[in-house]
């Protein structure tokens, strides 16, 4: 597959900062303002998996709005079944996703009632390398649920919960409490990978070189840091100290 950045294509900040251009073959459709309120009202009324979004900043986004976006999502299994791009990668990552028992025990101590909202795209290399591990962790946690939305219904979440260098990206993961309020977030990549990814590349390093190095990191890590950071996010929420780099 062609190399595609997992970010919003309408993000001029990143283009100006890096001198790169945006891929146009997989644009993120951001709903126009005049359609946002009807979409949210339909989802809140229990109208099924209708895409929903909000123009309110996510850091002060009403819980019922996040609940509407969450309700617009599907289970990971449904997302996996519908995946078209990187289908083999999604299935292989899911099949091989193992967990450290100690991480599961820590996550169980965080209690129940949490809901995880993941904004992901099937073609995104970061999504396919992390979301299956998040789903595997949730599978082991009674009373914790995961829903996945694509970048259409999740566009406003991506706009407001941006990466450290200001990009709207996939995956963007929010942790919601039982009331639907955001109590944690995780954006794009595990922290140690992201630190390298956001650093200036070596002069001789091509985009393809960087992508190959990134995917080699994911293969070596095998989801361990993603799962650890999910557990730390759950622990932070349970302790009343949300973990969210966008705050």
List the predicted regions and their residue ranges.
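Thioredoxin-like thiol-disulfide oxidoreductase module
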Residues: 148-171, 176, 197-201
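Typically the conserved alpha-helix immediately C-terminal to a functionally engaged Cys/Sec
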Residues: 128-139
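Conserved redox-active cysteine motifs that mediate thiol-disulfide chemistry
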Residues: 121-129
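Short active-site neighborhood of thiol/selenol oxidoreductases, capturing the structured segment around
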Residues: 112-120
